[in-house]
Amino acid sequence: DNPDAPQASFFYTEYIAKNGNQRPVIFSFNGGPGSASLWLHMGVLGPKVIKVPSNASDDGSPPYKIVDNKLSPLSEADLVFIDPIGTGYSRAIGCHTGEEFWGVNEDPKIIAEFIRRWITDNKRWNSPRYILGESYGGIRGPLLVSELRSGSITPIEVNGLLMVAPASDYQYLVFHPGNNSPHYGFLPSYAATAYYHDKVDTDKSLAEFYIDSKNFSLNEYGPALLKGTRISSEEKNDIMKKYSYFTGLSMRFVEDFDMRVDASSFRKELLRDEGYSVGRLDSRYKNTDYMAGGQYSDTDVSSEGFMSAYVTAIHTWFADIGVEMDMLYQSGDSDVYFSWKHPTQWKGNDFGYVNTVPHIARAQRYNKDFKVYVSCGLYDLATPCFTAENFMYDNSVDMDRVVFSEFEAGHMMYNHQPSFDRFLKEVREFILND
């Protein structure tokens, strides 16, 4: 009944330079929904980072390698890592429950309130401000920009939005019957994965092969899917041959799926003859399943390949800097994920797909200085590069004000050392070129 009573307690980690009130501030979070910020914190941005094998092999058991991050953007900007409610040590308090803040619309409102208070408490109203989000952060980030700049309390403009492997438009990511968007969006990442695992017959470089796959997907495959049963048998056969060429899948398999192979089936089928499945977050990873003959893999072998190292790293770092809490640090919470409210749902039925990309276009229209950086990995089978490219072009975004960067890596491209180096170089340039 008391609107001024505390509703939630945010846990966050800040790195601030002394007497640096004019320095840019980067507010960073991961995705899920239901994920804490440890992945960006300990993987690439923070002063200390965990090093997992760059070649997509398993991280094994501790001790793991935690090193100084000499490329951290801390040299140019202050960093604030935010754990959304229900993740990390952030919790609803008093009579409030986490479910009140778990939703597409609810989540950015409470995080925007946190940022407003942080800016006020730290006297940073005239500092350049950036939002950096990964994965579901591609949903949260654009909504947060709108919530900050047009909120009912105090409007706050943001200088830029940085999205890592963004999941900003679910139409391009969800494999539902009748939705062709993910099929032509995922195909180039299927092609890159098949190329990496030597399942394609080509003398071309990866870059050339990947570009060819995008052109095929956009100009031939996508239109063929739109034709549905109107497609001629001759054209369908031609499309299936090219699909097989780019993906490394057999013609029979492609035909059985009516040219619409979902990502889970692709991950299981590509290396089936070798007894492996490939990873979802990073398809360079491969491992065996309990049943080689199943339709889907047992788990995401790429997540299994690095999660332990990251969780160990955040707990080790917090212990080193004196963080002591009488509760569990929730690196990821499935309860948050499965309790998340989507505004397109009514009585359990989907009536549409969440899409926050129009918020990016809106920010561009009303803030002449607003700019965007998008990074993605060619081997990401969760939020592929071409899906991000498609939904940016499909929602009136001014691409002249977008830096779009592709990496020969996965969802967390910073697990790949050359991509780690280039990503941080580009982030620094993006901030400094304001």
Question: Whereabouts are the PLM-identified features?
Answer:
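Alpha/beta-hydrolase fold nucleophile elbow
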Residues: R124-Y136
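Catalytic histidine neighborhood in serine/cysteine hydrolases
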Residues: S396-M412
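Catalytic histidine-centered segment of alpha/beta-hydrolase-like enzymes
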Residues: G410-F420
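A catalytic-pocket lid/entrance helix-loop region that shapes and gates access to the active site
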Residues: G46-V52, V145, R149-S233, N237-K242
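Alpha/beta-hydrolase fold catalytic core
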Residues: K227-A382, D394
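Alpha/beta-hydrolase active-site loop
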Residues: P73-L74, P84, F101-I119
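Glycine-rich nucleophile elbow surrounding the catalytic serine of serine-hydrolase chemistry
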Residues: G133-S146
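N-terminal cap/lid subdomain of alpha/beta-hydrolase-fold enzymes
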Residues: P6-E100
